[in-house]
Amino acid sequence: MIPSDPPNKRPVKFRHGMLAFVLLALVMFCCVVVLGTGPQIPIVIGCTLAGAIALYLRFTWEEVLQSMLKGILDALEAVLILMCIGMMIGTWILSGTVPTLIYYGLYVISPELFLPVAFLGTLLVGIVLGSWGAAGTIGIAFIGIAAALNIPLGMAAGAIIAGAYVSEIASPLTDGPVLCAAIAKVNVFDLCKKFLPLVLIVCAISIALYYALGIMQGANFSNTDSSNIDELLTALSSSYHIGPATLIPLAIMIVCIIVQVPAIPAFLLGVALGVIEAVVLQGADISIALEAANTGVISTTGCEVLDTLFSTGGIEEMLPTICIVILVMAYVGILQHTGLMASLISPITSRLRRLGSLSAATVGTGALFNVLMPDQYPAIALSCKMYGEAFARRNVSGSIWSNIVNSSAGITSVLIPWNTCSIYMVTILGVSCLEYLPYAFFCYLYPAIVVLVAITLGEKLWWKRRV
């Protein structure tokens, strides 16, 4: 039985914080990579081991429990937002919003323009469905089209994945920005807008590179067969009312972002508009539209690609992600409120005097966490908690430093062959990580340019100097 009033606590040393981190990384790697399990149970084991270290340091069980609860409390807004996102995905598929985006994207495709169109197409769908949703839906369609157009699948997968992962930086509907915003205690819309000019610059560079690749490879795109595209277009137009009216929910969401409507009310408005359009434009029964918000959509278009594409959404679809977020934040809570995290990060941040070096260390740490702990959620949460206070002491706003964290921890995960993000992409697209990695331009250009801007212009642009 754990004593309720232990003697004076032992001093928390660097080795204690490092041990808690190394144990989680080791358990995550063994379970996820070697045994092929999901990340939830390894994180539970990591929480148990971190709690055991805290008990060894003579914290009481009540203190450990309160540490976990405080960590989870930081994530409650993110949990609510993730539920809203699930509801909105389901209703926007049923309303025809997502099908219309895909229809217009496929309509303008050509062999030479395939790579930039694949990048932009998955980017647009990713804004709504998230990176995994976009790659696992329209990404599958683009891979099939690439095969028909005789386009190297490594190039195609790189463009698809890069486009999908733009959403992990720029979309308020995706997990990474939501988690970062919750930990930094900032509005998720403000977070996504803050670095939008930088995102657009890197997207423009990526599109130019894909266009150049398409032109150079154009002569090799032989045996072109447009039947796959025609089949998808026919199935979309016969199953949904396609037209500008179905994009009204998306347009209103963009307005909400511009005028900084709080995240949860904006998402609920998006859900309501999706339900209304599903009933009015698509002729869905109101009960089916509401159930799409709960359990998602089960597509029956008769087209296998589209049925895979649209059988998603709803609160239930988000439950595994919500579980991971809660468990990760419980682990982070133990590290933060028992001093284990401070013991680990203080020796590092104390040596980083300038904003550029601190930003570079943050980006490097996020990438390292994705290597050592093969899942992006621990990488994001730990990076935010480790470096947030160091940025705050330099008077850098939460919407800026959380973007710096997410620029690495949120998107480099897909470049690591044993990370869950890469494993997922390899599984659904059928292309190895080493094949697509050279062509996922955004995923490594963006963090590099963030560091470059931080070193050269960061103190002028991002540092609010105290008067």
Q: Locations of the language-model features?
A:
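Hydrophobic transmembrane alpha-helices of multi-pass solute/ion transporters
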Residues: 2-87, 94-112, 235-239, 251-327, ...
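Hydrophobic alpha-helical transmembrane segments
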Residues: 18-19, 44, 79-80, 112-117, ...
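Generic alpha-helical transmembrane segments of integral inner-membrane proteins
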Residues: 22-26, 30, 48, 52, ...
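Transmembrane helix-loop junctions in multipass membrane proteins, especially transporters and channels
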Residues: 32-37, 55-59, 98, 130-134, ...
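Juxtamembrane membrane-interface segments at transmembrane alpha-helix termini
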Residues: 53-62, 146-153, 170-174, 277-289, ...
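Membrane-embedded alpha-helical segments and adjacent helix-loop junctions characteristic
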Residues: 59-147, 302-388
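Central hydrophobic cores of alpha-helical transmembrane segments
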Residues: 136-142, 160-161, 266-276, 404-405
